[in-house]
């Protein structure tokens, strides 16, 4: 199966583009508002299934763990394809598994932290002086949000 999600680092606009592509391919996938980051970047949440109470999957809690964003988006792509096609994942029929159940996916809880980890000080926007001071000169291992707060 060819994945919609490719091997591009998940900067905010790339995640937005993936979500648009996933939504176009899988119209049953819904986007719901979930808030904005310190720097105003949207925090995306996608849902599927029919239950009021949903199981929540969250990725990108720490900036330097941006790979988890890609893993969750890839999983969501495969899950949606299996749901659409009546397929299975790990031997479990996805449509049957979602009867009376719902899932919610937050592919990047900390978009500011991911931007800082991937783009350096440019990703910190107006908080660049603070990030520069807190990072000790190296943003590649940046974990926190744009205020320097660890989200877990």
Could you describe each region identified by the protein language model?
Residues 39-45, 114-118:
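Short, solvent-exposed polar/charged micro-motifs at secondary-structure junctions
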Residues 1-42:
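Short glycine- and acidic-rich boundary segments immediately preceding or forming the N-terminal edge
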Residues 44-52, 60:
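Short beta-strand-to-loop junctions in surface cap/lid or active-site-entrance loops
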